[in-house]
């Protein structure tokens, strides 16, 4: 035993030229797996041995790397977090297994499955670090190709679903608008027929708007109006909704943690998310004996070791709400797809397939997660997690919105690159008593201000061509003409607008599409605000 210890100790000094009979180094040399040995007792933990497989994998000669630290394998795209985890493991003298992007001598990159382990002698002294490696580039490339294929499949499903739903809505809108146009040409107008057509066209617009918001929520682009609330209170306020959704034949049980912490989420989107969960649970209970729903809330602490068990939630404190049904459940083949957009097992017309994807997007954008547990024939649990908010829940009633007032001939400059959209906004604002003008780009708007035209409000689209978008225009107008109030509008995503240090929007925003009364109300709020922020 002492003879073996001497051989190992000698090798640890770096004098390995005469260690050919050493079983350890002979095994390392002859294996087909790339391996190196480093000496932690020397400065910078240099390589003291590299086998032939390692040299072939990296393209280096032995004399080029012996005595060097392994960092020469790193390159511009090497993950610095992975590098730091390796350094930490070496400092702590523990095993580590990771995958990292490394570089060969010729500059080409490869994915390296790396395993590092400390080696001790009989006296318990650290003498080596032993590192085995494997080029797994083909596997990683195959995984990336699979992910890309899955993305394309999902994109195809998404675009197909969008086209299907929007074509139906456009058919409704276009058809009823044509009917209104035909009615206007007749000598005697059937008022009831026109009113019915207007009602159906407006309903289609509202459904299209809801569909867009659900898509943006899935993509985590929809702006959420977060405020501090308690999930127990949310359950209480939605009790009538729950009862209407399930009916008297379904038993509803709750277990609400009385010490539940608060969270900051959008209450409207939260209610919509719960409604989608309830609807799916209701459909799963059809035909089941003793149908039952169980709603539970609880506090949760996620640490660094457990975060992957919660879909990568950041370590911290969370609250959760779970809805469990004893319905039909789902097979494993469906479980992993139920939160994909437009994926549905329901019949045509019974669901768009956006409900649970909207739930997923809402939870993610709120800093949380959505998880589903299901067993075919047994039931399903859908649980949402949200970060705890330490702010004190306000006991005051929410402030009421400003009362609607007709405009008093305030002058409004409309900046919109779509003439039809701009003309509609002008008609609406003029009908409400404002005096509005239209320009089609930001440069023209600035020219109006520079020429001495006076306006009380700048109403500008967010996304415009020409090198200056709505935010840039708004900032320039506010800088040069500080008395002018600003209101932005967008049909894309309010998350494109930068946030202030206090967490609010830099400018007030109204989303497209919006009803005329909503636009007029928002304009009134901004005009009444002290600095353009209601």
From Swiss-Prot:
Domain PAS: residue ranges: 20-93
Residues annotated as domain Response regulatory: 411-527
EC number: 2.7.13.3
Post-translational modification 4-aspartylphosphate, affected residues: 461
PTM sites of type Phosphohistidine: 164
Sites bearing S-4a-FMN cysteine, chain numbering: 70
Domain Histidine kinase: 161-390
NCBIfam families: PRK13557.1, sensory_box
Record's protein name: Blue-light-activated protein
């Amino acid at each position: 035993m002492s003879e073996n210890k001497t051989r190992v100790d000698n090798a640890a000094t770096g004098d390995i030229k005469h260690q050919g009979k050493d079983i350890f180094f002979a095994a390392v040399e002859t294996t087909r797996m790339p391996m190196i040995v480093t000496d932690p007792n020397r400065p910078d933990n240099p390589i003291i041995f590299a086998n032939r497989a390692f040299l072939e994998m990296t393209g280096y000669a032995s004399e080029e790397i012996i005595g060097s630290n392994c960092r020469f394998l790193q390159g511009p795209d090497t993950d610095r977090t992975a590098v730091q985890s390796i350094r930490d493991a070496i400092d702590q003298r523990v095993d580590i297994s990771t995958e990292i992007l490394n570089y060969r001598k010729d500059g080409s990159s490869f994915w390296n499955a790396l395993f590092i382990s400390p080696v001790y002698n009989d006296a318990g002294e650290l003498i080596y670090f032993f590192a085995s490696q494997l080029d797994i580039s083909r596997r990683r490339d195959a995984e990336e190709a699979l992910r890309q294929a899955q993305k394309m499949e999902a994109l195809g499903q998404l675009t197909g679903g969008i086209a299907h739903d929007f074509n139906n809505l456009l058919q409704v809108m276009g058809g009823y608008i044509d009917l209104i146009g035909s009615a206007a040409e007749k000598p005697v107008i059937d008022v009831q027929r026109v009113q019915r057509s207007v009602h159906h066209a407006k309903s289609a617009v509202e459904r299209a708007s809801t569909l867009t918001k659900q898509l943006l929520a899935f993509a985590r682009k929809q702006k959420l109006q977060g405020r501090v609330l308690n999930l127990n209170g949310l359950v209480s306020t939605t009790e009538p909704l729950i009862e209407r959704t399930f009916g008297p034949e379904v038993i509803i049980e709750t277990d609400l943690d009385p010490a539940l912490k608060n969270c900051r989420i959008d209450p409207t989107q939260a209610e919509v998310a719960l409604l989608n969960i309830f609807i799916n649970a209701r459909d799963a209970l059809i035909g089941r004996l003793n149908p039952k729903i169980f709603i539970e809330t609880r506090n949760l602490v996620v640490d660094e070791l457990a975060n992957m068990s919660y879909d990568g939630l950041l370590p911290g404190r969370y609250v959760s709400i779970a809805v469990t049904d004893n319905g039909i459940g789902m097979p494993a083949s469906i479980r992993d797809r139920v939160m994909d957009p437009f994926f549905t097992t329901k019949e045509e017309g019974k669901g768009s397939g956006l409900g649970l994807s909207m739930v997923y997007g809402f939870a993610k954008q709120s800093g949380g997660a959505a998880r589903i547990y299901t067993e075919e024939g047994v039931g399903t649990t859908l649980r949402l997690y949200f970060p705890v908010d330490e702010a004190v829940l306000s006991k005051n009633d929410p402030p009421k919105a400003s009362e609607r007032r007709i405009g008093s001939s305030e002058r409004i400059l409309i900046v919109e690159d779509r003439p039809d959209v701009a003309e509609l906004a002008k008609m609406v604002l003029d009908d409400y008593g404002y005096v509005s003008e239209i320009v089609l780009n930001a440069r023209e708007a600035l020219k109006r201000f520079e020429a001495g035209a006076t306006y009380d409000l700048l109403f500008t689209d967010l996304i415009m061509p020409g090198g200056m978008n709505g935010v840039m225009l708004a900032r320039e107008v506010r800088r040069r003409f500080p008395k002018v109030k600003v209101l932005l509008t967008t049909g894309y995503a309010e998350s494109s607008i930068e946030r202030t240090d206090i967490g609010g929007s830099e400018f007030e925003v109204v989303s497209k599409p919006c009803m005329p009364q909503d636009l007029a109300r928002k304009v009134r709020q901004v005009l009444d605000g002290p600095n353009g922020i209601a």
